[in-house]
Design a protein with these regions (language model features):
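Short coil turns linking two alpha-helices in DNA-binding domains
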Residues: 19, 30-33, 59
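DNA major-groove recognition helix of helix-turn-helix
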Residues: 38, 48, 67
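A short, Lys/Arg-rich alpha-helix, primarily the initiator
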Residues: 1-16
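Short alpha-helical "recognition helix" segments of helix-turn-helix
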Residues: 23-24
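Recognition helix of helix-turn-helix/homeodomain-like DNA-binding domains
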Residues: 28-44
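DNA major-groove recognition helix of helix-turn-helix/homeodomain DNA-binding modules
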Residues: 47-62
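Residue-level signal for the short linker/turn that defines the boundary of a DNA-recognition helix
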Residues: 18, 44-47
Length: 72
């Protein structure tokens, strides 16, 4: 599994004061699943990415930056 850098996504969550638990609930997954995804132990599904973008005000053109920046 490739590793991605989610620091920008985590920063957006902090900026909007949205916890992993709250975002997980909006997406319809457990807080554990959200944490696993943010720590590269589980892949985000397409529908999860779309809901996260909608919830955090991330444009579709921002998806590569927030979700697919490789962790070096």
């Amino acid at each position: 599994m490739e590793r991605y850098d989610y620091r920008k996504l985590l920063g957006k969550m902090r900026e909007q004061r949205v916890t992993q638990e709250v975002l997980a609930e909006k997406v319809g997954i457990s807080a554990t699943s959200m944490n696993l995804s943010l720590n590269n132990k589980r892949d985000f599904r397409q529908e999860e990415i779309l809901i996260i973008c909608e919830s955090l005000g991330i444009s579709l053109s921002g998806i590569p930056t927030y979700f697919f920046t490789k962790d070096l």
